Structure formats: structure tokens, C-alpha cells
UniProtKB/Swiss-Prot annotation:
Miscellaneous comment: Present with 15500 molecules/cell in log phase SD medium.
Topological category with respect to the lipid bilayer: Peripheral membrane protein
Biological function: Functions as a component of the nuclear pore complex (NPC). NPC components, collectively referred to as nucleoporins (NUPs), can play the role of both NPC structural components and of docking or interaction partners for transiently associated nuclear transport factors. NIC96, which is localized to the core of the NPC and the distal ring of the nuclear basket, is required for de novo assembly of NPCs. It is involved in nuclear GSP1 import.
Protein name: Nucleoporin NIC96
Classification lineage: Eukaryota, Fungi, Dikarya, Ascomycota, Saccharomycotina
Gene Ontology molecular function: any one: structural constituent of nuclear pore
Length: 839
């Protein structure tokens, strides 16, 4: 009734007040809770509704005594008379369906049972179809490994389309936020290649691709040199490439490689290497400056330093920028000594002191003795006696001098390692390089136990200062600072912020010098060590090109063994195994088998000398067998066959070939040729099986490794393929003759048919698959031969005998087929019956 009222609430009534009240009543009824408001909807068929309506109609009619309803309506302000008048005026006839014809209860029950049965059948069929669909999808996902999203990403990456990885970190954030204790590259789990730390795409543009190829060429040459035990200057190669590049970043990288170049062929001592590099760099700078401002006199190192002092410490009016310099004969003597030390020219500095001894102040006369001891010492240290005297003079006269020469203060500080609480002299250190050199000069790694704390200053103290300052204090010299101070791990970390490709190759350069171990050995055991993980750096880098350039990926992964530790070697082997399984580039990576059966090595085998493998054969066998199993599980039969060949598992190879050939023979159309004009042994199962049989079975060494049963099955299947070719060429008589020689079907009598039927269960599955086709071929040949004989105009006594003999063979085959019909496809037996009837 409410629905009827709702449909007609806009119609006119006897009064506007009644309409308004009824509309409000309808709207409020929608908000009333009911006993079934939280129950789900029930979907029933039309027939079920009819049945239930019929049951309801058969019950006693409800009483129509609604005398108390008007009290409820009156309390709500609704006049019962108005409602009654409105309801009477409703034209309900047009909304009511005619009464359905009366249905007899017995007929309704029978109708319900029948329809219910049909619904159950349809529901069962639908459930079976849904189950089959789910099973098929599960089979596809499990056996074919069709991860479409992954394949889509791989294809996009191969074509150079950059994909934003949700798991990658933002390498472009400020380097000042780097935590020096925590950087870690790659996943620490077992999966080396898929740590998802790399955002680099070497195929993003032509410039990046060209840079990638140039760097890869250097790595290839480096590996060739390693394999030949030759000497390859990898740093010089990168210097030659970066020398022609422009930009601030490239300038940093160029000088970084020059720092690495200075480390080769040396016993790596971070402090000494840093000092020597900075001294050579400064001397080269003064030489270039001297050539631009040629003065009178010989181009000696002393004259070059004097020229530098004139350029840097004099104003335009030739007056000194620092007023309190000690100038002797027009030369600031202490500045000259300082910059000679800055250039590593200790002998020249001593010579200058000796020549100017008479002009030095009385309080400074003893310094010449100290300096001689300093110059003659191997580690440039002073004896305890001299050190004590120098410290006394420094504290009493030099340090407290308000108008003293700052270069004299610097020289005293450097020679005696004085006042280490104030290591820097701003008036003297004109550049970051000067600041670095000053600190390196003051470092003393082997502090005596009785040395006071304020006189101790180690490399680690210096490294902590650099880390605390961060890149903002060093402008565009931060990378060089990290390398010169031995913070190689943080240097790689910092390079990642602006160029992942250069960071990786800088890591390669450091690894070639065995510098990773030095970096970790200079850390206190109390502090967490930086986890660089050279293996993961290289593995992450190969992410964007391991599919497009698997050969190049191998060249980088074999670099993991540069550190030569047992863990590094193991990681290298694991990374190569993952590369083979992931890229599936088996021919490129593992090799292939030539047409003559000879093994053609892949790139991994070519690089075996760099892999530090104990048993080369076992290593390749392990990788190949794992890849073969993966290919077999994924249903990639051709890859699996190739890999098992490389693993020299010849019996498994023949097993797979038998399965492939059997499937081809049983599933292919009998009216189509098995071998096409463009087929070859790499794509056609029949040609593949023939080549394998000719290579393996004729080789006594290989043949002994293959089970006799496998060889017999292979030969049987090859004979079936030959029969198929005869059948396709319509050579009916020859086909039957070869079929009889095959001895799989009964050709004599009923006893033979029964025996063959009993032996059917003992046949190999690869043969069982082909029995239905063999029966069809046999009966088709018999049918065609009988037809030819019947059409022949030649009449002889043997003609009838031939037909009877052929029909007898057909009869035995039908008896045999009848005994095994439930183990064959239904359509096969129907086809055989049709052929037999036509005979």
C-alpha cells in the first residue's frame, strides 16, 4: 500500500491538508527501523515467488477490523475522514495486475520440482566452469610465470622508459642529511640483484647511453687486463674521459680520479698520500702561475714559491697584505719557509733557513736546530728534548706575540705540533686545500701512551671533524676532502647524490686499489662501521641494462671479486646465478651447443679466471642445472633442453626431447607436414630429436650416460615421425608396412589384439599419447587401399584376398581400440568407427 501511495502522492486529493499529511507520513515511514533492516536481500526466482504467494493465499484471511487505527492517526494530527476520502479517490485499478489464473497445487508442486532440478543442474555447470577457469588461471600463473606487471616494467626499461620505483629513496635530497653511520647499499638478504636501490636508467637518453658505453668499455678492458695479469691504469682512463667534460661536478670527479691515480703503486697510508697529493698539487699550481708571470732568474722551486708569494700576498701597490710579516731582503722569510713546506720542499726550506741564519732574531736562532732534526727524521718528528724546548719557546714567545708573523706561528705549530687545540690559522690557510694540508701535517697516528690528551690528534679525529662539518663547509671540494681523509665509503655515498654511474665507477677504482678494507680498518670498533657492500653497488647498477646488455652486466658482476675475500667470491657467484635465472639469456651467458655437438662457451665461462673458482666444471654445472630446473618449471622446454646439454645431463636431455616430440606428434594435425620448409633443428622438435639422436647415440661416451629405455623410446618416436611423413605423402602401402614393423598395433589375429591391449598399460606415456593417431593412420591407409583396389579395373584372384587381409587388420585394430577406448579421446573412437563402417 505504501508503494501505491508513494506512486500517487503527487496526484490531487480531496484536500491539500490530507495530501500533505500523507506525504509526510510516507517520508517518515522510510526512516522507521524494521526487523529486517539489517538483513541481506533475498533473491528468489519468479517460480519460487509464485509458489509462496500461492501458499499465502491458501491461509485464512486476516481480519479487517482496523477500528483502533484512527486513534494513532488522530494523535499525529491526521484526520481519519480525510484519509478515508483520499484512499477512496485513488485509481488503483491501473496499478494492479489482473488476478493470475488459479493453479492446482499438485501441478504447482511438480512444476516447482522440475524447475528446481533445472536450476540445480545449471548451477552445477556454472560452478564447474568457474572452477575450471580458476584452475586454468592458477596453472598459467604457476607454470608460465606470467607476471604481467613485471614484464611490462621490464619491457619499458629495455626501451629506455624511466619507471618510478616506490621503494627507491630520493637520492636528490640534501647531502647534509646523510647519516655517516648508516649508509647501506642493497638488500642484506640472499637476493643480490633485486635490492631495488637503483633509479638509474642508462637508456634514458643518448648522452647517458654514450657515457654508459664509454665507461663499460673501460671496465671491459680492465677485466681483460686482470685476466691476462697485466697492468691497466683504470684511473688514467677515466681522467682522459672526464678531462673533456665541463661542469662543476665533472671537475670534482676529475680531481677525485687524479687522487686515486696518485695512490697507485704505493703502500697506502692515508695521511702520507693526502699530504703528498696536496703538496704536488700546490707545486704544480705555483709552476703554472710562474709560467704566466715570468720573472728574472732561474725557474727554481724557490723562485716559483717567491713568485707565488708576490702574487698572493702583495696588493696592487706592491705593499704587503699582512703588515707584520718578517721581511728579509724583500722576501717574507717565514712565509717562504711555510710555502716551501706546503709544496713538500723540506730541503729547500732548510737551505733558506741556513742562508738567512744571521738575519733571524735571537729568540729564533734555535729553530734551525729543531728544523734540521725535523728534516733528517724519517717520520718528521722531533726528539723529546727538542720537542720540549720548542714547545717552551712557542708558548713563551711565539704564541703570545700580538704583532708576530702568522707564518712564523704556522711553521712552529707544524714542526713542533704545538697548541693542537687551535689547529687552524685563518690568516695562513687561504684555501680548503691549505686547511686540509695543515690538519694532515698535525696528525700523529702513533701517539705515545704518556702523551697528554691535548697533544693527541689522530686521523680518526680529523675524519670526525670533516663528517661533523658536512658538505656545506667544503663547497665543491667535499668529494676530494673525503677521499684525501680516507672516508672512501662516505665519498661513494656523496657521489650517489648527483651521479650514480660515477659513484659506481669510483667504487670500482677504490676497490681496484683495495681501499675498502682500509676505510673500515680506520674506524673505532666502538662505532658502527659503514656498510658499503661493494657487491650490491655493482648489482644495483646492472638493474637497468641486465636485460638489454647481459654481457656488460657480467663484466660488472665479476668485479665483485676485486676484494678477493671468500665472501666476495661467494657473492659474485650468487649474483651470476641470479643473472642467469632472471634474464634467461642462457646462450649469451652460459654458451650453446653447435651443430656438430661442440660446446661454445658463454661470457661467464670466458671470465672464469676472474671468478676464483675451485672447480670450474662444478661451478658451471651448478649454475646451469639450477637454470635448467627453473626453465623446466616455467615450461620453457627449449631453454631447458639447452641448459641440460650445457650441464652434460644427457639422459635428462633425451627425456625432454622425447616428451617434446611426443607432444608434437600427438597434437599436430595428421593432414599437415611435421617439418616446414623454413624449420631448423632449433625450432622444430622432429629435427631437434633427429640431431640429438645422431650426436648422442653415435658417441659412445655420451650414449653410455643415457638409459636404454630412453633411447628406445626416442627411436620409436622418430619412427612414428617417419610414418607420419609417409602418410602425409599418401604412401599407403609403405605406411602400413612401417606400422607393422613398429609392432605397436595388432596386425595378425584377435589373440594379438588382446595381448596388445594387455601390454598397453606397460607402454611409456610418450608412446601412449600417439596410439590414437596410429590407429587412425592405420585404418585410413586400409580404407584408401581398399578404395583403390575396388576402383581398379584389374581383376585377379589376389585382389579379393588383399581386401580380406586389409579388413582383417582393420578388424583387429578395432578390437584393440574397443579394449582401450576409455583410455583414448572419445572423438578418436568415433572416428575409427566411422572409418570401419565405410569399409
Amino acid at each position: 500500500m505504501l508503494e501505491t501511495l508513494r506512486g500517487n502522492k503527487l496526484h490531487s486529493g480531496t484536500s491539500k491538508g490530507a495530501n500533505k499529511k500523507l506525504n509526510e507520513l510516507l517520508e517518515s515511514s522510510d526512516n522507521l527501523p524494521s526487523a529486517s533492516s539489517e538483513l541481506g536481500s533475498i533473491q528468489v526466482s519468479i517460480n519460487e515467488l509464485r509458489r509462496r504467494v500461492f501458499q499465502l493465499r491458501s491461509k485464512n484471511k486476516a481480519s479487517k477490523d482496523y477500528t483502533k487505527a484512527h486513534y494513532l492517526l488522530a494523535n499525529s494530527g491526521l484526520s481519519f475522514e480525510d484519509v478515508d476520502a483520499f484512499i477512496k479517490d485513488l485509481q488503483t485499478n491501473q496499478f494492479l495486475e489482473p488476478n493470475p489464473p488459479k493453479i492446482i497445487e499438485s501441478e504447482e508442486l511438480e512444476f516447482y520440482i522440475r524447475t528446481k532440478k533445472e536450476e540445480n543442474i545449471l548451477m552445477s555447470i556454472e560452478q564447474l566452469l568457474n572452477g575450471a577457469t580458476k584452475d586454468f588461471d592458477n596453472f598459467i600463473n604457476h607454470n608460465l610465470n606470467l607476471d604481467w606487471a613485471q614484464h611490462k616494467n621490464e619491457v619499458m626499461k629495455n626501451f629506455g622508459i624511466l619507471i618510478q620505483d616506490k621503494k627507491t629513496v630520493d637520492h636528490k635530497k640534501s647531502i647534509s642529511s646523510l647519516d655517516p653511520k648508516l649508509p647501506s647499499w642493497g638488500n642484506k638478504g640472499n637476493n643480490i640483484l633485486n635490492s631495488n636501490e637503483s633509479r638509474l636508467n642508462v637508456n634514458e637518453n643518448n648522452i647517458l647511453r654514450e657515457k654508459f658505453e664509454n665507461y663499460a668499455r673501460i671496465v671491459f678492458q680492465f677485466n681483460n687486463s686482470r685476466q691476462a695479469n697485466g697492468n691497466f691504469d683504470i684511473a688514467n682512463e677515466f681522467i682522459s674521459i672526464l678531462s673533456s667534460a665541463n661542469g662543476t661536478r665533472n671537475a670534482q670527479l676529475l680531481e677525485s680520479w687524479k687522487i686515486l691515480e696518485s695512490m697507485k703503486s704505493k703502500d697506502i697510508n692515508i695521511v702520507e698520500v693526502g699530504k703528498q697529493y696536496l703538496e704536488q698539487q700546490f707545486l704544480q699550481y705555483t709552476d703554472n702561475l710562474y709560467k704566466k708571470n715570468m720573472n728574472e732568474g732561474l725557474a727554481t722551486n724557490v723562485n716559483k714559491i717567491k713568485s707565488f708569494i708576490d702574487t698572493k700576498l702583495k696588493k696592487a701597490d706592491k705593499s704587503w697584505k699582512i703588515s707584520n710579516l718578517t721581511v728579509i731582503n724583500g722576501v717574507p722569510i717565514w712565509a717562504l719557509i711555510f710555502y716551501l713546506l706546503r709544496a713538500g720542499l723540506i730541503k729547500e726550506a732548510l737551505q733558506v733557513l741556513v742562508e738567512n741564519k744571521a738575519n733571524i732574531k735571537k729568540v729564533e736562532q734555535s729553530f734551525l736546530t729543531y728544523f734540521k732534526a725535523y728534516a733528517s727524521s724519517k717520520d718528521h718528528g722531533l726528539p723529546v728534548e727538542y720537542s720540549t724546548k720548542l714547545h717552551t719557546e712557542y708558548n713563551q714567545h711565539i704564541k703570545s706575540s700580538l704583532d708576530g708573523d702568522p707564518y712564523r706561528l704556522a711553521v712552529y705549530k707544524l714542526i713542533g705540533r704545538c697548541d693542537l687545540s687551535r689547529k687552524n690559522i685563518p690568516a695562513v690557510t687561504l684555501s680548503i686545500e691549505d686547511w686540509l694540508w695543515m690538519h694532515l701535517m698535525l696528525i700523529k697516528e702513533k701517539d705515545a701512551e704518556n702523551d697528554p690528551v691535548y697533544e693527541r690528534y689522530s686521523l680518526e679525529d680529523f675524519q670526525n671533524i670533516i663528517i661533523s662539518y658536512g658538505p656545506s663547509r667544503f663547497s665543491n671540494y667535499y668529494l676530494q676532502t673525503l677521499l684525501l681523509s680516507g672516508l672512501y665509503g662516505l665519498a661513494i655515498d656523496y657521489t650517489y647524490t648527483f651521479s650514480e654511474m660515477d659513484a659506481v665507477h669510483l667504487a670500482i677504482g677504490l676497490a681496484s686499489l683495495k681501499l675498502f678494507k682500509i676505510d673500515s680498518s680506520t674506524r673505532l670498533t666502538k662505532k658502527p662501521k659503514r656498510d658499503i657492500r661493494f657487491a650490491n653497488i655493482l648489482a644495483n647498477y646492472t638493474k637497468s641494462f641486465r636485460y638489454s646488455d647481459p654481457r656488460v652486466a657480467v663484466e660488472y658482476l665479476v668485479l665483485i671479486t676485486l676484494n678477493e675475500g671468500p665472501t666476495d667470491v661467494e657473492l659474485c657467484h650468487e649474483a651470476l646465478r641470479e643473472l642467469v635465472l632472471e634474464t634467461k639469456e642462457f646462450t649469451v651467458l652460459l654458451g650453446k651447443i653447435g651443430r656438430d655437438g661442440a660446446r661454445i662457451p658463454g661470457v661467464i665461462e670466458e671470465r672464469q679466471p676472474l671468478l676464483h673458482v675451485r672447480d670450474e666444471k662444478e661451478f658451471l654445472h651448478t649454475i646451469t642445472e639450477q637454470a635448467a630446473r627453473r626453465a623446466d618449471e616455467d615450461g620453457r622446454i627449449y631453454d631447458s633442453i639447452l641448459l641440460y646439454q650445457l650441464a652434460e645431463e644427457y639422459d635428462i636431455v633425451i627425456t625432454l626431447v622425447n616428451s617434446l616430440l611426443s607432444d608434437t606428434l600427438s597434437a599436430s594435425d595428421l593432414d599437415q607436414p611435421l617439418v616446414g620448409p623454413d624449420d631448423n633443428s632449433e625450432t622444430n622438435p622432429v629435427l631437434l630429436a633427429r640431431r640429438m639422436a645422431s650426436i648422442y647415440f653415435d658417441n659412445a661416451g655420451i650414449s653410455r650416460q643415457i638409459h636404454v629405455k630412453n633411447k628406445e623410446i626416442c627411436m620409436l618416436l622418430l619412427n612414428i615421425s617417419s610414418i607420419r611423413e609417409l602418410y602425409f605423402n599418401k604412401q599407403w602401402q609403405e605406411t602400413l608396412s612401417q606400422m607393422e614393423l613398429l609392432d605397436l598395433l595388432p596386425f595378425s589375429d584377435e589373440l594379438s589384439a588382446r595381448k596388445k591391449a594387455q601390454d598397453f598399460s606397460n607402454l611409456d606415456d610418450n608412446i601412449v599419447k600417439n596410439i590414437p593417431n596410429l590407429l587412425i593412420i592405420t585404418l585410413s591407409c586400409i580404407s584408401n587401399m581398399i578404395h583403390i583396389l575396388n576402383e581398379s579395373k584389374y581383376q585377379s584372384s589376389t585382389k579379393g584376398q588383399q581386401i580380406d587381409s586389409l579388413k582383417n587388420v582393420a578388424r583387429q585394430c578395432m578390437i584393440y581400440a574397443g579394449m582401450i577406448q576409455y583410455r583414448m579421446p572419445r572423438e578418436t573412437y568415433s572416428t575409427l568407427i566411422n572409418i570401419d563402417v565405410s569399409l
